[in-house]
Amino acid sequence: MWGYLSLLPMCLAFWAIAGIWTVFSLAVVNKAVNLTDGFPYISVCGNVPPQSCIFSQVLNIGAASAAWICILRYYQLRDWGVRKWHNQVILWTGLLCALGTSIVGNFQEKNQRATHLTGAFLAFFVGIVYFWLQLFLSWRMKNLPQPGAPWIGPLRLVLCSACFILEVAMVVLHSWSMRSVSAICEWVAAMLLFILFGLLAVDFSRLDSCTLCLQPGSGSLRPPPDSPTSLHVQL
């Protein structure tokens, strides 16, 4: 039986995918974008109200959920014996991805282009680095637990490769003024990133609790003993 924490990545993926396409639908209905002129970038769909308000809310909640997932993953990898420096690099790339997602949602492209593009870089390119680092870790440390079916690892490799190729294609095609094709690459890359976050549900399938513990001082009670199916996050 899967623990309830596995619902968090799945909910994030569903929330983000459904939310982004809702923004797209509203932009089309409200004529904020014209599909006859070409397929729009995600940011263009969320440029003006009311869809810009929904866009911000969707990405803010998604960013907060992603940050919490990255923190849980950090402590899970720590309990599996991953080196601290490697684990911290993975954590910070994930948190930067979450930060970039929030920046994209709150700084619309038409108002703060430079800030918006910085957030997009963090969300897309640093985000895919987060998953590449975890793939490298699972390949390098064969003794790490590998929850889920044997095909989960190859699936992640395919998704990471496709996402990275699409992100590079997005930038190159944009520079060649092939905006519509570039936008399609952006949409597909975003969906793949959401799916990669959703696949972390497999890694969280063995977790059934998460306990926050204060650092014990002299004479204070010690935190409860570790359990293989629980995380103890020290503050």
Curated annotation (Swiss-Prot):
Please give the residues the UniProt entry marks as glycosylated: 34
Q: How does it sit in the membrane?
A: Multi-pass membrane protein
Database matches in InterPro entries: DRAM/TMEM150_Autophagy_Mod, Frag1/DRAM/Sfk1
Which residues point to the Cytoplasmic side?
1-8, 73-88, 138-156, 202-235
Its annotated function is as follows: Modulator of macroautophagy that causes accumulation of autophagosomes under basal conditions and enhances autophagic flux. Represses cell death and promotes long-term clonogenic survival of cells grown in the absence of glucose in a macroautophagy-independent manner. May have some role in extracellular matrix engulfment or growth factor receptor recycling, both of which can modulate cell survival.
Q: Which family does it belong to?
A: Belongs to the DRAM/TMEM150 family.
Q: What is this protein called?
A: Modulator of macroautophagy TMEM150B
Q: Organism source for this protein?
A: Bos taurus (Bovine)
